[in-house]
Amino acid sequence: MKPAAPLPSFSRLLREPVLLLAFGFGSGLAPRAPGTAGSLVALALAAGFTGLSFTLPAAALWLLLGTVVAAGIAICGSAARRMDAPDHPGIVWDEFAGLWLTLALAPAGFGWWIAGFVLFRIFDIVKPWPIAWFDRRWKGGLGIMVDDLLAGLFAGLMLRVAGAVL
């Protein structure tokens, strides 16, 4: 088994902007559960983007999400190469994108966003089929991003169904 890749220093993140983004502005440096730490930062940023209204105009939301995903493929791929680790656990930009996809699909409201956070983390950690299948087979920046995007999609669709039923 290959030893875990070491964490970069925060000063290295500041010197290398792609690592600063990939490591979620430093949240990926958390010694335990960096994915959850990154997801919490992503949740806080999303709340800030919406002015705590927990909703954005659809066009702005999907444009922002598309940009985050496209940039994320490049950011995660570059960071993985710089860290010499195919999917370093500290790279959490993919958590940002996945959670934001969940929130884009969620009904508006604080409670829905908290439920989305929890569901997203469950899908991202447990990785049910087909998430695990993609996680094992796809490599590079797209491979790092795809499992979190699928986790975000699954969590968001569950919230949509729950919102329609409730």
State the predicted function of each range.
Residues 17-18, 47-51, 59, 70-74:
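Short hydrophobic/aromatic-rich motifs at helix boundaries and adjacent loops
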Residues 148-164:
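Final/C-terminal transmembrane alpha-helix of multipass membrane proteins
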Residues 46-63, 102-114, 160-166:
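Helix-coil boundary and interhelical linker segments in multi-pass alpha-helical membrane proteins
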Residues 30-49, 60-64, 68:
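Short Lys/Arg-rich amphipathic alpha-helical segments
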Residues 2-40, 54, 73-103, 122-153:
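Interhelical loop and helix-boundary elements at the membrane-water interface
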Residues 47, 65-74, 98, 103-104, ...:
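Alpha-helical transmembrane segments of multi-pass membrane proteins
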